[in-house]
Structure formats: structure tokens, C-alpha cells
Amino acid sequence: MSVFVIAEAGVNHNGRLSTAFRLCDAAKAAGADAVKFQHFNSAALWNDDRIAHLELRDAEIAVIAKHCASIGIEFCCTPFGVREVGVIAPLVKRIKVASGCLEKWELLASVQATHLPVILSTGMATEGRIDRALKALGYYATLEQSLTLLQCTSAYPCRVEDANLLAMDTLAQAFGAEVGFSDHTKGITVAIAAAARGATVIEKHLTLDCTAEGPDHKASIEPQEFRVMVRAIRTVEEALGDGVKRAQPAEAETRRAWYGD
């Protein structure tokens, strides 16, 4: 099993392109498979321009994607509107849908129209709401082999006791999709545990400075800790094995000592 690790840069660039580049570089150095940003229009989305300084313009999104390609890390992005879906679709290999967009039907229809693989966070949602979102995405007809559902608790930060990793099993059984975990807890223990429980995608917020001003920095980890997390996840991958119960080659000498064969 290979875990796809996403470094969620989100809005931790604080509206500065140079910081966005540094986040991409840090994600690559830490061993992440992808780095993810957000594309939104705050006035259109929330009728509130207080976080307008955290927006990235279309041209900036394209420049960040180009930078990611130049350093060898996948560029991911979450669109928060139909227009933004059209902007990012030519730049990404997959689209990440945020928990807050689970009931935005026009957006989901536009995501379906891209025919790209989908990663869907499920924070704040019940099975029934997820089912309706999957119908809007055309999952049952067209996307069955290219959907990953992320267990997510939309609290920043999330308490460990609210992470509910067992819900990954529920999602897998209910919808037959790949499952993963979008982690908002402090530290890296819960993300590593999710990998051990079979998550195929781990998403974790990355910041250059946890003490910086901004909505997500306190629910993020810095590059050195992110690197430790990725290494631990890769160790978990090795330890999981293939599930076949058999005598391992490393046991041969011990078996000979006990049984003589």
C-alpha cells in the first residue's frame, strides 16, 4: 500500500507568492507527494472580504503550479466556486473538494464535468449527505475507480478524541471507495495512526511558522515535523506487508532451530 501524502498549504501563504513558493519547496523537501492550495473569491463565497488578502489570483495559481512542476511535486488545489473549477482543472491531476462544498451542487456538477479523480473531504457530514454529494458527482455511474473519501473533523485544531478514525471503515463499507484522512489534530500521531488503519491519502496542514497570524497556522505543523511524519508513514507502509500469513525468510534460521527444516 502506498499512502499519498498531501501537504495542505491552504492559505498559509498569507497572500504572498514568495511564501507560497517556500511552502512548495518545504513540502517537497519533507517528502510529500503533493502540495495543495485553495482558490476562492471571499466576497462571492461568504459575502465577506475580511480574508480577501488570502486569495490567490488566477495567474498566481498558474505560477504556483508551474513552480511545483519545476521542483517535482504534484500541484493540488481546492476550488470553492464553479469558476475556480475551470481555472484549476487544466493544472491538476485530481480535484480536492472541501468539506464545506459537500452540498454545493453546481460546484459538484462542474467537478464531475472535468472527469478528473476526486478527493472528497467529509467533515460535518452524515452518510446521507455524503451519498447525495456522490450522486451529484456521478460517482455511482462514472467515478467509482477514481474517488477517495477523507474522514475529516472540521475543527481547527481538532481534538484527538474527535478524530474518529474508525469512520474510515464506515466510509469504505458504505460507499466502496478508497478512504483517507484529513488531519486537523495537533502533532502527527493521529495521521500516522490513520496510515496504519489503511488510509490511502493523508492530508495535513503545513506552515512555515505555527505562530504566524492567520486562520490555519495553529492547526498546522512546520516542515521538520512534517518530514518526521512522512518518514513514519513510509515506515508504516513497509510494516503493513501484503497480508499473506506465511513463514517469512527472516524466520528461516529460527524455524530450523525449532523444527529442523
Where are each of the predicted segments found?
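Catalytic cores and adjacent flexible loops of soluble metabolic enzymes
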Residues: 1-261
